[in-house]
Amino acid sequence: MAAAIASGLIRQKRQAREQHWDRPSASRRRSSPSKNRGLCNGNLVDIFSKVRIFGLKKRRLRRQDPQLKGIVTRLYCRQGYYLQMHPDGALDGTKDDSTNSTLFNLIPVGLRVVAIQGVKTGLYIAMNGEGYLYPSELFTPECKFKESVFENYYVIYSSMLYRQQESGRAWFLGLNKEGQVMKGNRVKKTKPAAHFLPKPLEVAMYREPSLHDVGETVPKAGVTPSKSTSASAIMNGGKPVNKCKTT
């Protein structure tokens, strides 16, 4: 009898002890999954945020990379001269094809539209409302030229901004027989003065030039200033043909 009672007491104590140990372990088992889930979620959020930030930085770097595929070239005029830009930005023709002043960046800035930039000077060729060519430190709508292949496979370059008011005839880049640049409204596309043959030296990648207003251009000393308003263009027989937007 006593043995039975003792064994019963021992059994009760053992059960009480097991229950006492089971309770904290159960609470620990219940709390640990939630903690793990919280840690997992936090880690995932941290990982995703880092990946997103890295992706944004990568996209920003890509945007800064050169995206426009153009050429470094010499422009040989059918008159027998290479177009050249002097250090002060003045333009004329030369028969010497070895000078760096005849090197130009031909940068695509639209569909069959290019910017012509002197490699040595970094200045853009521009045409103002009177048809005069001048160098521009900034890329403006006056620096845009339409590039067209003529019947004889020579290339002609016409202003994207100005043309004859009455006839609608385009104004062209051209050199006369003495190798001097001509007013755009005096150059006819059927004449050798307007015919150029690009002689590419290498393919190059360019960043898209930032488009500025024509009024922001500051011509260099000794260079014909830009007459770019609509009034001056109409007074001189020309008119703006469109308002160019940023490409």
Curated annotation (Swiss-Prot):
Belongs to the heparin-binding growth factors family. Keywords: Growth factor, Nucleus. Interacts with SCN8A. The lineage of its organism: Eukaryota, Metazoa, Chordata, Craniata, Vertebrata. The keyword 4Fe-4S does not apply. Its main location: nucleus. PANTHER family: FIBROBLAST GROWTH FACTOR. Coiled coil: none annotated. Residues 1-38, 216-247 are annotated as: Disordered. GO terms for cellular component: cytoplasm; cytosol; nucleus; synapse. SMART domains: FGF. One of its GO terms (molecular function) is sodium channel regulator activity. It is found in: Nucleus. It holds the Pfam family FGF. It comes from Rattus norvegicus. Residues 15-25 have a biased composition (Basic and acidic residues). This is Fibroblast growth factor 14.
